[in-house]
Protein backbone atom coordinates (compact mmCIF):
# COMPACT_ATOMS: atom_id res chain seq x y z
CA UNK A 1 0.00 0.00 0.00
CA UNK A 2 1.33 3.43 -0.93
CA UNK A 3 2.03 5.91 1.83
CA UNK A 4 0.07 9.18 1.72
CA UNK A 5 2.75 11.85 1.40
CA UNK A 6 0.43 14.76 0.62
CA UNK A 7 0.79 17.87 2.73
CA UNK A 8 -2.89 18.70 2.29
CA UNK A 9 -4.53 19.32 5.66
CA UNK A 10 -7.33 16.90 6.50
CA UNK A 11 -10.04 17.36 9.09
CA UNK A 12 -11.87 14.69 11.05
CA UNK A 13 -15.64 14.61 10.53
CA UNK A 14 -18.15 15.99 13.03
CA UNK A 15 -18.93 13.40 15.70
CA UNK A 16 -15.41 11.96 15.79
CA UNK A 17 -14.27 11.02 19.29
CA UNK A 18 -10.61 11.64 20.14
CA UNK A 19 -8.17 11.62 23.05
CA UNK A 20 -6.00 14.72 23.30
CA UNK A 21 -2.38 14.48 24.37
CA UNK A 22 -2.30 14.83 28.15
CA UNK A 23 -6.10 14.73 28.38
CA UNK A 24 -7.95 12.65 30.95
CA UNK A 25 -11.26 12.35 29.05
CA UNK A 26 -12.21 11.80 25.45
CA UNK A 27 -13.57 14.70 23.40
CA UNK A 28 -16.20 14.68 20.64
CA UNK A 29 -15.64 17.06 17.72
CA UNK A 30 -18.62 19.28 16.92
CA UNK A 31 -16.98 22.03 14.86
CA UNK A 32 -14.02 22.64 12.55
CA UNK A 33 -11.89 25.72 11.71
CA UNK A 34 -13.07 27.60 14.78
CA UNK A 35 -11.95 31.15 15.51
CA UNK A 36 -11.37 31.97 19.18
CA UNK A 37 -13.35 35.15 19.81
CA UNK A 38 -11.08 36.86 22.34
CA UNK A 39 -7.81 36.27 20.47
CA UNK A 40 -8.76 35.66 16.81
CA UNK A 41 -6.69 32.44 16.86
CA UNK A 42 -7.94 29.87 14.31
CA UNK A 43 -8.14 26.32 15.70
CA UNK A 44 -8.72 23.11 13.73
CA UNK A 45 -11.52 21.88 16.02
CA UNK A 46 -13.92 22.60 18.84
CA UNK A 47 -15.11 19.71 20.97
CA UNK A 48 -16.98 18.76 24.10
CA UNK A 49 -16.49 16.06 26.69
CA UNK A 50 -17.56 12.56 25.68
CA UNK A 51 -20.00 11.10 26.66
CA UNK A 52 -21.35 14.14 28.53
CA UNK A 53 -21.80 16.39 25.49
CA UNK A 54 -21.97 20.18 25.38
CA UNK A 55 -22.47 21.19 29.03
CA UNK A 56 -21.46 24.88 28.93
CA UNK A 57 -18.80 27.23 27.52
CA UNK A 58 -16.55 26.17 30.40
CA UNK A 59 -16.34 22.68 28.88
CA UNK A 60 -15.65 23.59 25.24
CA UNK A 61 -12.20 22.62 23.99
CA UNK A 62 -10.38 24.26 21.08
CA UNK A 63 -7.54 22.17 19.64
CA UNK A 64 -5.47 21.37 16.56
CA UNK A 65 -4.76 18.12 14.70
CA UNK A 66 -1.31 17.91 16.30
CA UNK A 67 -2.88 17.65 19.76
CA UNK A 68 -4.85 14.50 18.91
CA UNK A 69 -3.23 11.42 20.41
CA UNK A 70 -5.85 8.76 19.52
CA UNK A 71 -8.95 8.63 17.32
CA UNK A 72 -11.53 6.33 18.93
CA UNK A 73 -14.41 6.92 16.53
CA UNK A 74 -14.61 8.49 13.08
CA UNK A 75 -17.77 10.59 12.56
CA UNK A 76 -20.34 10.14 9.80
CA UNK A 77 -19.14 10.67 6.23
CA UNK A 78 -21.16 10.98 3.04
CA UNK A 79 -20.95 13.00 -0.19
CA UNK A 80 -21.98 16.18 1.61
CA UNK A 81 -19.17 15.68 4.16
CA UNK A 82 -16.60 15.00 1.43
CA UNK A 83 -17.64 18.19 -0.42
CA UNK A 84 -17.38 20.20 2.81
CA UNK A 85 -13.97 18.65 3.52
CA UNK A 86 -12.81 19.96 0.15
CA UNK A 87 -14.12 23.45 0.99
CA UNK A 88 -12.15 23.37 4.27
CA UNK A 89 -9.01 22.29 2.42
CA UNK A 90 -9.46 24.95 -0.27
CA UNK A 91 -9.90 27.62 2.42
CA UNK A 92 -6.43 26.76 3.68
Spans of model-derived segments:
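Intrinsically disordered, low-complexity, charged/polar segments
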Residues: 48-92
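Residue-level marker of beta-strand positions
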Residues: 15-17, 26
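Canonical SH2 domain fold
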Residues: 31, 45-48
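Mixed-charge, Lys/Arg-rich low-complexity intrinsically disordered regions
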Residues: 1-14
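Short beta-strand-centered aromatic/proline hotspots
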Residues: 25-35
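Short, solvent-exposed secondary-structure boundary/capping segments
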Residues: 35-45
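Short, glycine/acidic-enriched capping/hinge loops at junctions between secondary-structure elements
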Residues: 29-31, 40, 59
